[in-house]
Amino acid sequence: MASNIVFTVKDDNPIGATLIGRAYIPVQEIVDGEEIDRWVEMLDEDKNPIQSSSKIHVKLQYFDVTKDRNWGGGIRSAKYPGVPYTFYPQRQGCKVSLYQDAHVPDKFIPKIPLASGEHYNPHRCWEDVFDSITNAKHFIYITGWSVYTEISLVRDSRRPKPGGDITLGELLKKKASEGVRVLILIWDDRTSVDLLKKDGLMATHDEETENYFQNTDVHCVLCPRNPDDGGSIVQDLQISTMFTHHQKIVVVDSAMPNGDSQRRRIVSYVGGIDLCDGRYDTPFHSLFRTLDTAHHDDFHQPNFTGASIQKGGPREPWHDIHSRLEGPIAWDVLFNFEQRWKKQGGKDLLVQLRELEDVIIPPSPAMFPDDHETWNVQLFRSIDGGAAFGFPETPEDAAKAGLVSGKDNIIDRSIQDAYVNAIRRAKNFIYIENQYFLGSSFSWSADDIKPEDINALHLIPKELSLKIVSKIEAGERFTVYVVVPMWPEGIPESGSVQAILDWQRRTLEMMYKDVIEALRAKGLEEDPRNYLTFFCLGNREVKKSGEYEPSEKPEPDSDYIRAQEARRFMIYVHAKMMIVDDEYIIIGSANINQRSMDGARDSEIAMGGYQPYHLATRQPARGQIHGFRLGLWYEHLGMLDDTFLHPESEECVTKVNQITDKYWDLYSSETLEHDLPGHLLRYPIGVSSEGNVTELPGTEFFPDTKARVLGAKSDYMPPILTT
């Protein structure tokens, strides 16, 4: 447990900030809930009183979260008002489409029964985006970390569409020439950190895309991550060079579902998928077999130096999650775009919807209240006054608008709030897919670091481990499943990738120590993986006749040639999703790291929603979220099983752990006889009886690489870059 609450006081210099001192209040003094109101002495780095015996006055009080009447209660009823104290309220009468990957082929998903008596029916993200852009009549607004004009959205030869072979760039130019207002905001990465670029972490085509649309009717603005007004020169430099615009949204006007040809409505897309190269994939996640079809002109492999279609696979498959929002919630996404365009878009080119009010209907429900498929949805963000127009100026007004105040900065941190709120309400299980998993550094072991210097303070990992602890103490089952990539995209041996893996190890170790301590206190000697278990995704394919034959070969003795000969590679997990009890889901652009959860670092957007007729109140929820989770599990495991209906049960977690242990052995073995039967692999670490995260025997390095699975602390990269 953290032993002190630490108050840090710095001198606000124009360049940097000098530490004046820190004040400490022992946690023991506040846990009984008594209010503390007193002066506390300031100490230096070595815990000695600073000169002139300075003090600060603090007033604080602790409230035990388990005393909250909503703790562990789930959504409970359709009257659940949403996450409190946020910028956007929860909207009712919405419609949501959930997407696994950019595309799902016909007949991929087996029959998954839902409460309605129907079966789960998957949606197809890029086909729907193509239709939405093609059919827009007034405006198309897009924001992305990256937008690439040369990709095509429709690539399934069994599901052709009229005009489907057009590139995204040509499609947007065509729509703009028809009089549709096309506005694109993409992150300007010209200033981004060279340290990361050389490790293969950034390649966004921002300048190519800007040049492509020059002298066309499409308005494309490169958007730097500008700081708010409050920072020092160094802080401002950090924000503009180290942080990104990460929201991935499309907002269009759309036809009415009832066929009214005169009226239009708003439809929005929110999630993890950028409209750029390397993102199109299906749940098959092939490494070699699509290199002369869907991926011939879209070969993405940034983890090997010099990888190319000419040298052949494996390409890096891409697993991601996205959503389409209809009804009042779609307008909140539109308002977010307008706030950002007014702040950084330059010219005032936004369509004035007031002038179109006889055409575009005002925000109104997309579903009737008694429709069992209706959704309640809330929009969350990580963004600050440097990136969004019209934020209040004072801390008091900010608090009223559900915003928090930083150092002379107003911040929307509601994505983190939404995760924390959902974890605290959870009753039975949590299923997470995320590109990163690190944080709660205040609770990391202080062996070879000073946790207070790391500043990856977001609460999500600690909230998860404390939720499990509370359930162990109550004698109730609770399981957390987390899927992450093998390593963050980039050269796996590089300093930045190894540093992130090191933070991830410290995060997992902190969580496993919490779980093991709770089990021991109950006299249980159980495997902590029965409560908290981590996975990655990978594929391995035998060579088939008629496969694409590359004209060149990778360098000898490279990771690339080794992976090509072993016929294996990770499937990159880029999803940012959490499912709680099959009744509540969060989907967005935000990773589980400080950059995404901070609010004043990367800009992000996410939706959180549930179906009021499909709650886990008396029996398990069996609505769209349940169907979506089982669709994902089928994609990852290559099978479905009755135990999967109760993910919290020991039978389910034991079965999933056994299957994924076997799949990891097949993935990492020297020989290959058949395709891998599923993609979900045990994350290749062990957990000691004390909770230390260790190497799996024989797995110091990821297969085909010299990259350590447990990572390595970086001596030259500041934590602000890699957390």
Which residue ranges define each predicted feature?
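HKD-type phospholipase D/PLD-like phosphodiesterase module
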Residues: 2-59, 77, 82-139, 143-421, ...
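Non-catalytic propeptide/linker segments at domain boundaries
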Residues: 56, 60-72
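Extended, hydrophobic alpha-helical segments in both membrane/secreted and soluble proteins
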Residues: 168, 419, 432, 460-468
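Short, contiguous acidic/charged loop-to-helix segments that flank catalytic cores in large enzymes
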Residues: 407, 451-456, 564-567, 594-595, ...
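Active-site His/acidic residue clusters
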Residues: 439-453
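Pan-eukaryotic secretory-pathway lumenal catalytic ectodomains of glycan-active enzymes
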Residues: 535-543, 554, 558-561, 565-566, ...
